[in-house]
Amino acid sequence: MAETAASRTGSVSRKTNETSISVSVNLDGTGKSKISTGVGFFDHMLDQLARHSLIDMEIDAKGDLHIDDHHTVEDTGIAIGQAISKALGDRRGITRYASIDLAMDETMTKAAVDLSGRPFLVWNVAFSAPKIGTFDTELVREFFQALAQNAGITLHILNHYGANNHHIAETCFKAVARALRTATEIDPRQAGRVPSTKGTLV
């Protein structure tokens, strides 16, 4: 009888004086999402993250939006990162590394990931305006910093060029999504081994 593959899912509930957030992810999904953060542009970006990574995501976030969006965006990144880390488990059999150059109209952005267990963000992205609509562009970096730190991944994001700030932000999310899609995939040639000569990624 064939063995049933272990479920690669993770759920996190996080409550502080500033936010209340619940996140569930399925690494072996189809990119379905149910997202509500109260921040419209951020919801749109998270939908792109789920759809292009093929990671199913359910995200419900309530935060102190009467102050600003910062706590909600950062804490959502923390919770998604923790949920992904749970879903990865001991990271046996994963592809681990991936990178992609992603184009959108006039914009080109590169994302490279290593699901190493060692959190690090290299951010080389510049926006030409402080806001996209009402959304603070500096929060894009804050989100990815929180995601990388709590998922235990090394993440490099480089915007090669682009003129439209919406496109720059969106290519960051889409490029990271596509890199995660590849890096989290199970490589049958690994035969369940941890992809590291150290024997551990946690």
From Swiss-Prot:
One of its GO terms (molecular function) is imidazoleglycerol-phosphate dehydratase activity. Pfam families: IGPD. Pathway: Amino-acid biosynthesis; L-histidine biosynthesis; L-histidine from 5-phospho-alpha-D-ribose 1-diphosphate: step 6/9. CDD domains: IGPD. GO terms for biological process: L-histidine biosynthetic process. It catalyses: D-erythro-1-(imidazol-4-yl)glycerol 3-phosphate = 3-(imidazol-4-yl)-2-oxopropyl phosphate + H2O. Keywords: Amino-acid biosynthesis, Cytoplasm, Histidine biosynthesis, Lyase. Its main location: cytoplasm. Signal peptide: none annotated. GO terms for cellular component: cytoplasm. Its EC number is 4.2.1.19. InterPro entries: IGPD_sf, ImidazoleglycerolP_deHydtase, ImidazoleglycerP_deHydtase_CS, Ribosomal_Su5_D2-typ_SF. It is found in: Cytoplasm. Belongs to the imidazoleglycerol-phosphate dehydratase family. PANTHER family: IMIDAZOLEGLYCEROL-PHOSPHATE DEHYDRATASE (PTHR23133:SF2), IMIDAZOLEGLYCEROL-PHOSPHATE DEHYDRATASE HIS7 (PTHR23133). This is Imidazoleglycerol-phosphate dehydratase. The lineage of its organism: Bacteria, Pseudomonadati, Pseudomonadota, Alphaproteobacteria, Hyphomicrobiales. The gene is hisB.
